[in-house]
Amino acid sequence: MRILGLVSATHDSGLAILEDGKPRLVLEEERLNREKRTTAFPRQSVIEAFGAGGAGLRDIDVITTPWDQSRLRVNFGRVLLAGLPHSLNLLRKSSHTPQRNEIVRLNAVLSRRLRRITGEEFELPRIVPVGHHDAHAAAFFVSPFEEANILVMDGFGDDASTSIYSGHGNRVERRWSEGILDSLGLVYTFVTKYLGFKGFSDEGKVMALAACGDDSYVARFWDLIKLLDDGRYAVDMSYFNYGKYGELKPLTAKFYDVFGPARPPGGILEDRHLAVAYALQAVTEGVVLHVVREMTSQRPCENLVLSGGVALNDGVVRALRECLGGPVLVPKHPQLAGALGAALIARQAGGA
């Protein structure tokens, strides 16, 4: 079976071809269009892999994408209903990036763009979405482990922001997850923006900035995220508005009352900003350690696979290695929730 994994609505767009379970090609669009972390539809990648008219797509049995848009619509609807009337702001295009607006109608958009290459009469292979965090968990398949615990943490997927999986042999299985609003990744991103940097991009700068701060805000930052039993946690939404306004107004007045006004982009970095960065990093590491300690107590296994955007946080990875004392695998490309991850999960499901 030949499976084509395709990413077209988020950063790091590209494709992967899996043939009888073996990767034959993994190609990110940025290698061709020279735009780092590009969100462009991978037109050049498709042409490179299948020819100018896409004729080679006839040899593909299944196309898969790392977003289950039906599941995302359901969970988006729940968030919308829970936050009425203010959550109606989430229906405004400006409350999300253009790419996130596209995800909810991904299959239709994908078919239309592929037919611009192949022509309208071309019969495309069926398009099968897989869960976003499932695709992240596919990092296990490129690990050297026969079994492992798998932690997926990012901004949000189609139904979760944190997911715990068990990996064994050629299968991964989700054990539990946290919903899309209780998102450590979104907290990190919106505090990054508060500190005057670009969200969904400059989180690494804030991680580095944390080394220059002190612990004066750590205790207050723990008020934002509560640790619960069984390795779970909850974000105190009295500090955050992203469940009602998205990116338009992600922080509440309560947040500003505690931490002060936001730093404008390019503004002077005050000691207060450094302390907020320190607190953000310290609490992030603490939450991840809380989750991992519980997941390993529930399923003892010395091997851990870490995937999703949080896997890009060096401080988190270092803290995990110091705490666990065992192997912590971070894939060479933690954004494996892309084309290859989707194709690997589709193979596990038999392409169905």
What positions do the PLM features span?
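Short acidic/glycine-rich loops and adjacent helix/strand connectors
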Residues: M1-A352
